[in-house]
Amino acid sequence: MDTYDSQGPTSRRRTSNLKDYFVSATPLQKRLKLARRQSSVFPSPSRRKIPQCSQLQEDIDPQKVAFLLHKQWTVYSLTPLYKFSYSNLKDYSRLLSAFIAAEKQKGLAVEVGEDFNIKVIFSTLLGVKGTQRDPEAFLVQIRSESQSSREHRQDKVLWTGWFCCVFGENLQETVSEDFTCLPLFLAHGAESNTSLIGGWFQKTFDCCFSPLAISAFNLSWMAAMWTACKMDHYMATTEFFWSVPCSPQSLDISYAIHPEDAKALWDSVHKTPGEVTQEEVDLFMNCLYSHFHRHFRIHLSATRLVRVSTSVASAHTDGKIKILCHKYLIGVLAYMTELAIFQIE
């Protein structure tokens, strides 16, 4: 069973001033809003496509995909990067390495240890996109080499973050060539390192990170869409977690369902081939509520859904996500990209 941190994402001075950021960039704000109205990529809130395996995934390095899976990522939305260039990734690696070393020299909270040589590596994630027009995703890693491990030349990964845009190419078309739109950022590692690196990106590319909370409404959609995915074999039980506010402390309820039973339930309410509708999501969740009430006499509709876990992925309202299935990597990221774009608008 996955464990999730109860701590919220690190607060940053600019995070709470997202609207202020757009006040100083009014033309960009207008273009983003226009994109949302005109874009045919983002379906209406009442209807979405069932995630499918993308042909572009064939370009993804299998080792990099394996590294992305089965890790708990904290998700953020990110405003467009100004003057970012893929041809300068080596320079960014050098500059960020120097920045981290300088911050550590100042005695700031940089969790890299005492006896390590730190290096930062920027690399592209080819194939992590929805269409050819989406900007390339890229990965940032903080690696270290201790005195004792130099003979073996094995680097230890201390922190990882990646930036992507999946089926969000219309957003890129609304901004000038000086901006690169990668609205979804995922981080794994010490929160202090996330804050430090986020600060460097904000200063270097005039962008703004904001923690991406996932609502109970969004979790219901995730549960339905991921249950609808056809699996070659199921790797995990389908689980739901609800929070019950009560005194003196909150009560949590977990509900585990065999994945084949969950799929059978979904098939019984699913009527629109290739799509998921709001009505089907509501029916799916209401059937779960009714079944639970019949057995335990508890009204789950009076509680708050805080986490869902399937063989495709798991997600928490705290903005934590874990992708479990390579086949549906792009499908999961597409929905997360949509949520990130809606948040920055």
Swiss-Prot record:
Keyword Nucleus appears in the UniProt entry: yes
Spans through the membrane: none
CC terms in the record's Gene Ontology section: inner kinetochore; nucleus
Swiss-Prot/TrEMBL keywords: Centromere, Chromosome, Nucleus, Phosphoprotein
Modified residues (Phosphoserine): 40, 54
Keyword Manganese: no
Primary location recorded for the protein, binned into one broad class: nucleus
Entry's localization field: Nucleus; Chromosome, Centromere
Classification via Pfam families: CENP-L (PF13092)
Domain of life per record: Eukaryota
Cited InterPro entries: CENP-L
Task performed by this protein: Component of the CENPA-CAD (nucleosome distal) complex, a complex recruited to centromeres which is involved in assembly of kinetochore proteins, mitotic progression and chromosome segregation. May be involved in incorporation of newly synthesized CENPA into centromeres via its interaction with the CENPA-NAC complex.
Family the UniProt entry places it in: Belongs to the CENP-L/IML3 family.
Subunit structure: Component of the CENPA-CAD complex, composed of CENPI, CENPK, CENPL, CENPO, CENPP, CENPQ, CENPR and CENPS. The CENPA-CAD complex interacts with the CENPA-NAC complex, at least composed of CENPA, CENPC, CENPH, CENPM, CENPN, CENPT and CENPU.
Stated name of the protein: Centromere protein L
Native source species: Rattus norvegicus
